[in-house]
Amino acid sequence: MGKITDISELEYDFLFIDTPPYLSNHLPKLIQIADLIIIPIKSSYLDLLAIQSTIDLIKSESKIDQTLVVFNMIKANTTLTIDILIGLEEYNVKIANTHISDLVSFTRSVLVNGVKSDKNAQKQLDNLTKEILSALI
């Protein structure tokens, strides 16, 4: 088993590590070596409260400038997203322009091998991909 610090030596263009902040005692080391930290958030007050400890940890590692908050599972025709955006202002963290909607296509994607048949879902993923790649360049 290698060390976390060896990750940057791996021959990959992209490496995604998906973990809830409370499950990894290695999170500070992972944050230190990350080129970009993506924090998904739903439009809920509980998620807004839960994100604070993650952002505090990222700030303690001086990586807030390499952090991007991405809204996920956004409900249509609600003001919740605006409320959460206002709540996030105090954290002084970059928020992705692309929001991922709560579309049935995303839920079904595991069963049908993607979202190719839903142009709206595909457009959201394409836009988010471009935004992430731009943040890395």
Pin down the residues of each PLM region.
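Short histidine/acidic/glycine/proline-rich micro-motifs that form metal-
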Residues: 43-45, 72-77, 116
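Beta-strand-loop-alpha "switch" segments that mediate conformational coupling across diverse proteins
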Residues: 75, 86-113
